[in-house]
Amino acid sequence: MNLNSPAVSMLGGDTPAHGGPNSVLGGQGPSSILTGHGPNSVMGPNSILGPGSVLNPQSIQPMQSQQMHSLQGSSMQMHSHLANSNLNLNINPASVGPDRNPGSVMHHNLDINPPSVAYQNLTVPMTPLAYSVYDRDALTHQAPASNIAATMVPATPASQLDIPMPALQNIVSTVNLGVQLDLKKIALHARNAEYNPKRFAAVIMRIREPRTTALIFSSGKMVCTGAKSEEASRLAARKYARIVQKLGFQAKFTEFMVQNMVGSCDVRFPIQLEGLCITHSQFSTYEPELFPGLIYRMVKPRVVLLIFVSGKVVITGAKTKRDIDEAFGQIYPILKGFKK
């Protein structure tokens, strides 16, 4: 190819080096891309800067700095300043350029349809913009009011939550009926009563509610066992006294007294009984050949504890429920020190 020929010049102009109808830099040839009216021109009337182009000079309107407000729920606002901006980014697909060419999407008339962005304050009433996770700490998110009251959790120390509470298993109480009794007559006429003087010198009587057992002696003394609370033991003793009254005896209900309370608890961990017996030898007795549990005699309160390797603890000898709770509260930290 002869590059000096005017017909094949690629750099524009009429000289052998810069001219010709096929110039890409000058003239009005079909291959010109910088000037002229060629179909490939980037600056001509049919170029990307032409009247029907996207970047029409008339579609670029100067605009002062405005604030964009985007509603995020009821409490979130996003402020964005378009400082020193020369583009009005109100994009409406239905708008046209100044020459009514449908190719322009930026129009200086800013025709506003209901779904489009508002012109003055650029408020978007349709879908709120999603905010970043980094903005959540700086935003105060206000949830709608709820009819459900907030649950208040008391600040209870963890040490109190870990300590189990002992439960009453048996209460032994005594009553004086104040009259001599014929035990044979009681055994013959009363229900659920048995009397065998060769084995035991008392009538054994049982009732179902409260589920208890009474030992009635000829002297008028009575022992009530099996109740789970002091109130239940008192109620059962009164029922036994009423049964004796219905058999013709002038029985009274006097001198009611709780003699023994038995409670039990599970600490839920195995215990080293040998180490406990050696460390607390002054209060402990442990003979695994005779009894599998360690016998711990506490001085104050004056109770006896039976401690087993499985973690079960039986407290007996107490007069009140408070004594049982106090004794277990003292022994529990000691048992944790000998946890296997």
UniProtKB/Swiss-Prot annotation:
Protein name as it appears in the record: TATA-box-binding protein
Gene Ontology MF terms: DNA-binding transcription factor activity; minor groove of adenine-thymine-rich DNA binding; RNA polymerase II general transcription initiation factor activity; RNA polymerase III general transcription initiation factor activity; TFIIA-class transcription factor complex binding; TFIIB-class transcription factor binding
Superkingdom of the organism of origin: Eukaryota
Residue ranges, compositional bias (Low complexity): 57-68
GO cellular component, one term: transcription factor TFIID complex
Annotated region (Disordered), positions in chain: 1-78
Location(s), subcellular: Nucleus
GO biological process terms, semicolon-separated: DNA-templated transcription initiation; positive regulation of DNA-templated transcription; transcription by RNA polymerase II; transcription by RNA polymerase III
Keyword Ion transport belongs to the record: no
Family designation: Belongs to the TBP family.
CDD domains: TBP_eukaryotes
Main subcellular location of this protein, as a coarse class: nucleus
Sequence repeat start and end residues: 168-244, 258-335
Keywords, in A-Z order: DNA-binding, Nucleus, Repeat, Transcription
Quaternary assembly: Component of the TFIID basal transcription factor complex, composed of TATA-box-binding protein tbp-1, and a number of TBP-associated factors (TAFs). Binds DNA as monomer.
A UniProt-annotated Pfam family: TBP
Role according to the record: The TFIID basal transcription factor complex plays a major role in the initiation of RNA polymerase II (Pol II)-dependent transcription. TFIID recognizes and binds promoters via its subunit tbp-1, a TATA-box-binding protein, and promotes assembly of the pre-initiation complex (PIC). The TFIID complex consists of tbp-1 and TBP-associated factors (TAFs). General transcription factor that functions at the core of the TFIID complex.
Polar residues biased stretches: 69-78
